[in-house]
Amino acid sequence: DLVVGTGGYVSGPILRKAAQLGIKTVSHESNAFPGVTTKLLSRYVDEILLAVPEAKKYLDPKCKEVVVGNPVRESIVYADRQKAREKLAVGDKICIVSFGGSQGAHRLNQAMADLMAWHTKKGSEFEGKIHHIHATGKYGVEDFPQMLREKGANFEQNPNVDIREYINDMDDCLAAADLVICRAGASTLSELEAAGRASILIPSPNVAENHQYHNGMVLVNNNAAVLIEEKNLTGESLCKAVEELVSQPQKLLS
């Protein structure tokens, strides 16, 4: 009765054939910049379901599109902020949550080591005022502590530094966070929006059609995020962006 695709290459010929057979067809596009398959299918399927309205301009003008967003887990939407902060021992500190995906991202880990060295430095303005949860990913779990040591970060036995391989309790971490630093995948951004969290986005350049950049710019253009392209990412640029936000709490709330 209905064939649903989600924009991957394999869904193209299946949805096209279903349309030829007169079966109702729907394709969902999770990114702000539609992929090749979605663009082609927009001529044939009954409806294109979009995550954001900004994607409309790339589709066939005659197609029928509906903006529905991306699916988000209920636990993200309904997580209790106070309980999450108590569980994670954040207290009244500014909570930063950062991650680069399950495999990790070397450039992000390098910049995050600089950031931790900056806010844990003895005598610095933010020493003891920031609780930082960082997921290194699979390939950073062994290297990251050494990066911190080389940069002079005060992290060992520091209750305000929580280093993990992976974040398994993302609902609690997002609920507790004041600022999130991460990539700009469609699902991640949908969770940030659902949780209402300010973010610094560092889109992966290694994705089809640079779609993470386009995803991130949707939030930037709605004053919901700051974006740093990976080619411009340094410890200095990240620390500057974080300092501007945490020094003006109203920016984190707006």
Predicted regions and their residues:
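Conserved donor-nucleotide binding/catalytic region of nucleotide-linked donor-dependent transferases
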Residues: V226, K231-S254
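Donor-nucleotide binding loops and adjacent catalytic segments primarily
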Residues: R81-K83, A89-L179, Y213-M217, N221, ...
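Active-site-proximal region of nucleotide-activated glycan assembly enzymes
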Residues: A18-Q82
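An aromatic- and histidine-rich active-site surface loop
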Residues: L2-L21
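Acidic donor-binding loop of glycosyltransferase active sites
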Residues: L2, I167, D171-L189, R197-A198
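Short hydrophobic beta-strand element within catalytic cores of glycosyltransferases
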Residues: C182, A198-E209
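Short alpha-helix at the nucleotide-sugar/activated-sugar donor binding site of glycosyltransferases
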Residues: A19, S42, L174, L192-E193, ...
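Short glycine-/small-residue-rich Rossmann-like dinucleotide-binding loops
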Residues: G7-G8, G101, G137, G185, ...
